[in-house]
Amino acid sequence: MKKSVGAVIFYKNLYLIQKRSLKKNIYFPGLYGVFGGNVNKLEKSKRAIIREIKEELDINLNYDQAQYFLKISINSKHFKKNRVRFYYSLKITKEQLNSMILKEGESLHLINIQKIKKLEFVPWDLSAILYFNYFIRKKRSVKPQ
């Protein structure tokens, strides 16, 4: 099974997303998505997200900034192996936001949830952002009334 991580990065009421590269070895080229990547063998998912954010945005995170909130299992004809993706929320500081340097992907965008809904997005990354926004940040009930 292939493991990966994704970061729902937020600052105030805005989310930091990326436009994915058009490189041929990238899944979902040219779509929007969250920052993240593969988990190395023997690596814990929380360490992986901190490493990936350092590699992609050149910022250092405190270990406690990464808060696990969702795991999505993916079994698709488009992938040779089943996949699992772990999502972490990352509330960033103004200093971290201002010091970011994009190292991977085409571009980064700090936008609100309404604009995110209008973009062509990696399907499970969009699900993770929407779930986080409505059921964790806004604390809507998941249970039936």
Residue ranges of model-derived segments:
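Conserved N-terminal beta-strand and adjoining loop/helix that marks the start
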Residues: M1-I17, F35
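Active-site-adjacent beta-strand/loop module that shapes the phosphate/pyrophosphate-binding cleft
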Residues: K2-K3, L70-L97, H109, I113, ...
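A structure-centric signal for secondary-structure junctions around beta-strands
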Residues: K2-S4, K12, F28-P29, V84, ...
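Short secondary-structure boundary/capping segments
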Residues: A7, K23-N25, K77-K80, S99-I101
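Short, charged/polar surface micro-motifs in flexible loops or helix N-caps
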Residues: F10-Y15, K23, N40, I74, ...
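N-terminal first-folded block
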Residues: I17-K19, K23-F35
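Nudix hydrolase/Nudix homology domain
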Residues: N25, P29, I101-Q145
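The catalytic Nudix box helix
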Residues: V34-F69
